[in-house]
Amino acid sequence: MVKKMEIARILLKIVMWILIVGFGCNFILQTISYSFYKGAKKMTNLVCMPQYIQMTDALTGYGHNLDRDSDKIILFFGGSNYVAYNSVGKYANRFACPFISVDYYGTQDSKGKMNLSSMQRSALDLYDWAKQQYPQSEIIIMGHSYGTGIATYLASERKCKTLILAAGYRDISDLYNKIIPIFWGPFKVFISNNICTKEYAKAVDSSVYIIGSKKDKTLNADLQKKLVTCFENAEIKIFDDIAHEDYFVTESVIGYIHQVIE
């Protein structure tokens, strides 16, 4: 009897520590991920000046070429530190059409609390605002790194012509495991606010293009080859020598994007 109780205590301690480690690591990694958007500073080495947009009373963003007459617009979701101001200021001048990015609720000047639900609502509200402003334009959704998940969510919920993902992931564990590699199999249950790109992908009916690079050490080319299988109809383009942050400043990538959106 004593031996059984001792075994039970040991098992309870193991379970307790698994719970502490699992939920604790999730909290730490989510806090870090969100801090890249909440605390991101405006970059100074921009190639164009972003224009401030008040989309709703609580939601803000930035854009470029907002008055440009075009049959298409781009909605862009940036990766870590690439809040709306930085995404537009670094990338928008490479496209001759309205280029718009949103700051998720609870980040930058957007009010509220940042979580999965509010990120999804930010994307939907961005789309609805853009559709009202440009009712005749086709919508192209682009995402990079962390932003590819919400970009895919939006494409699964709203009609768009094209979805372009650079350095994407299947769910947030692909990112978390780069830092603390514990979220495998059943241990994914500890992840809260999981951005499940592979689930959103099932409902995407637009053209999908996935871009990766053999030089990308953050979300590598092999991961992009796995991600493309999550979509019913997607093409993949793997470049040889592009670092993780350089996709949208590299001429070969920009040329490829222009080719697929024309």
Residue ranges and their predicted role:
Residues 58-129, 142, 149:
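Membrane-embedded segments
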Residues 8-64:
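An N-terminal hydrophobic leader/cap segment in hydrolases
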Residues 134-145:
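Alpha/beta-hydrolase fold nucleophile elbow
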